[in-house]
A protein has these predicted regions:
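NAD(P)H-binding glycine-rich loop region in Rossmannoid oxidoreductase-like domains
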Residues: 51-90
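Conserved beta-loop-beta element that borders a ligand/cofactor-binding pocket
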Residues: 114-115, 148-173
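Flexible, glycine-rich beta-alpha linker
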Residues: 119-120, 134-138, 162-181
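Glycine/proline-rich active-site loop of Rossmann-fold NAD(P)-dependent oxidoreductases
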Residues: 144, 157, 169-185, 212-213, ...
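A conserved pocket-lining segment of Rossmann-fold NAD(P)-dependent short-chain dehydrogenase/reductase
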Residues: 166-176, 186-210
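C-terminal substrate-binding subdomain of Rossmann-fold SDR/epimerase-dehydratase oxidoreductases
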Residues: 200-203, 207-314
């Protein structure tokens, strides 16, 4: 099996590529991104690719005889509000290019991460797969398009498109990349380096989150799931939900001198438009999804690994 990963140098891609290479063989997983310097760190095989460059995308699929695409290239929520036009170009036209290139190039399967940002203020807590989608951000709108276009290509052309609606993803290996849930990573960096963090959301802001190992598990587990068991193309998944204050308290147990304050900015409105909890029972039933990490265990692992990475003792 030959795999192409777009957006391979992002928060998820930089950890997914090594995992897939271990699974399928280094030579069978092609990393692609627009950032050459970061691609070199992932090592070959890699290709410099802007997903808006359809000609290059077609050529890569043909040259490497790609069977599966993990389409991770995207502009995230907060950055998407700073430049909604670019967000539309990359996230909507990019996913269309990937779907069309896959259809014409004989690709068997596409995995597209979606997001809790597809929901909006009208969404009730604990939404299911069929809950109303009325996002208030360009990022969320673009991901609704990705989901619906994926469904369309599956129903019309038989292209096996699958995806998980990821919550905020937390990782110590890669810095956050412009999302509304970045505070859940930044707080750990600040706790170790400065002993203090100013959140850009209110203390009672509660959002669904997931530790990176679980995010990688969800993506790869759904990719390999028995198609006859799948009721949906895109599934809710979640690891945990916690408030900013709860995160502070958990960090304080491990770094007692840590302090925090809360100064909500424009990202607070985005956070308020998303549900605080997610129902992922369909994923549990259809492909045996189950997260491995809770808040306390994740916090301990984050602090242990980040302090080593930053060369700091806590």
């Amino acid at each position: 099996m030959r795999v192409l990963v777009t957006g391979a140098c992002g928060q998820i891609g930089s950890e997914l590529v090594p995992l897939l290479r271990k699974k399928y063989g280094k030579e069978n997983v092609v990393a692609s991104d627009i950032v050459v310097e970061k691609l070199e760190k992932l090592s070959e095989p890699y290709e410099v690719l802007n997903v808006l460059d359809r000609e290059k995308l077609d050529a890569i699929i043909k040259e490497y005889e790609i069977d599966v695409i993990y389409h991770l290239a995207a502009i995230l929520s907060a950055k998407g509000e700073e430049n909604p036009q670019l967000c539309f170009q990359v996230n909507v036209n990019g996913v269309y290019n990937v779907l069309e290139a896959a259809r014409l190039g004989g690709v068997e399967k596409i995995i597209i991460p979606s997001t809790i940002a597809v929901f909006g203020p009208e969404t009730p807590d604990y939404p299911k797969e069929v809950t109303i989608l009325k996002p208030r951000t360009m990022y969320g709108i673009s991901k609704v398009f990705a989901e619906l276009a994926g469904e369309y290509y599956y129903n019309k052309y038989g292209l096996d498109v699958r995806g998980v609606r990821l919550p905020g993803v937390i990782s110590w290996k890669t810095p956050p990349g412009g999302g509304t849930t970045d505070y859940a990573v930044e707080a750990f960096y600040a706790a170790i380096e400065k002993g203090h963090y100013t959140y850009f959301v209110s203390e009672d802001t509660t959002l669904p989150m997931m530790y990176m190992p679980d995010a990688l598990k969800a993506l790869t587990q759904l990719a390999e799931a028995d198609p006859t068991r799948l009721r949906f193309r895109f599934y809710n998944v979640v690891g945990m939900s916690f408030s900013a204050k709860e995160l502070t308290e958990v960090i304080k147990k491990l770094i007692p001198h840590f302090t925090a304050d809360y100064k909500p900015d424009e990202r607070q409105k985005i956070a308020e438009s998303w549900p605080s909890h997610i129902d992922d029972s369909a994923a549990r039933e259809d492909w045996d999804w189950k997260p491995d990490w809770d808040l306390e265990r994740m916090a301990k692992d984050m602090i242990e690994n980040l302090s080593k990475k930053l060369g700091k003792s806590v």
